[in-house]
């Protein structure tokens, strides 16, 4: 299946931003394949026998995307970037629920119910939470570098697409990507999840 025409997707996103509810119905078939690919990217480090499937992640992200009252997507790349951010937050919430179950407590339920918490091993949940804490610290130092990581690593966007979303040059994205990766590697080595 070919990816959707970026121009057509951008037009639909702009129509959605102007309140056209029918544009959402036309958009989803055009981006569903990309969202599933993005979900597979997000789940690539999970155990092979996990119960959390890309479809469940796409469905949860879709619910959050369409209920977001402040949606103002400028382009296909921006939409995919926002989708990646939402999917990452869903996985972090999922890891937190897994840790809460492990300790005997349970936070609120979502479409990714507690049965799916078994999809993450204890180590994977801990690593995801450690990465999330490191990204929070990176945010304090450089919002743009955190966004570059989110868009490149979690969103699978190229340097050029990331530059478009962030309104910077591709060389700036490449510099930020290198700096952020180096910094995060150091943080991941020295910080246990808390």
Where are the language model's segments positioned?
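Short, charged helix-capping/linker segments at alpha-helix termini
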Residues: 2-4, 18-26, 38-58, 170, ...
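Sigma70-family region 2
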Residues: 14-18, 41-48, 60-78
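Σ70-family region 2.3-2.4 aromatic/basic alpha-helix that recognizes the −10 promoter
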Residues: 32, 55-63, 76-96
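Arg/Lys-rich amphipathic alpha helix in sigma70-family domain 2
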Residues: 41-44, 88-106
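Internal acidic/polar
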Residues: 57, 62-68, 104-124, 131, ...
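Short amphipathic alpha helix immediately N-terminal
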Residues: 139-159
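Helix-turn-helix DNA-binding module
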Residues: 155-175
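Short, Lys/Arg-enriched C-terminal cap helix and immediately downstream tail that follows
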Residues: 181-194
């Amino acid at each position: 299946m070919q990816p959707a025409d970026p121009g057509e997707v951008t037009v639909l996103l702009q129509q959605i931003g102007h309140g056209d509810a029918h544009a959402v119905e036309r958009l989803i078939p055009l981006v569903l394949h990309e969202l599933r690919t993005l979900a597979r990217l997000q789940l690539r480090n999970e155990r092979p026998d996990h119960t959390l499937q890309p479809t469940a992640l796409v469905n949860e992200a879709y619910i959050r995307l369409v209920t977001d009252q402040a949606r103002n997507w400028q382009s296909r790349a921006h939409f995919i970037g926002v989708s990646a951010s939402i999917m990452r937050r869903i996985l972090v919430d999922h890891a937190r629920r897994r840790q809460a179950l492990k300790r005997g407590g349970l936070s609120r339920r979502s479409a990714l119910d507690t049965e799916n918490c078994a999809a993450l091993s204890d180590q994977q949940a801990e690593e995801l939470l450690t990465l999330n804490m490191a990204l929070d610290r990176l945010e304090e130092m450089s919002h743009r570098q955190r966004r570059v990581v989110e868009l490149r690593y979690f969103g699978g966007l190229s340097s050029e697409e990331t530059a478009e979303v962030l309104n910077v040059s591709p060389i700036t994205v490449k510099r930020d990507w290198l700096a952020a990766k180096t910094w995060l590697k150091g943080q991941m080595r020295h910080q246990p999840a808390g």
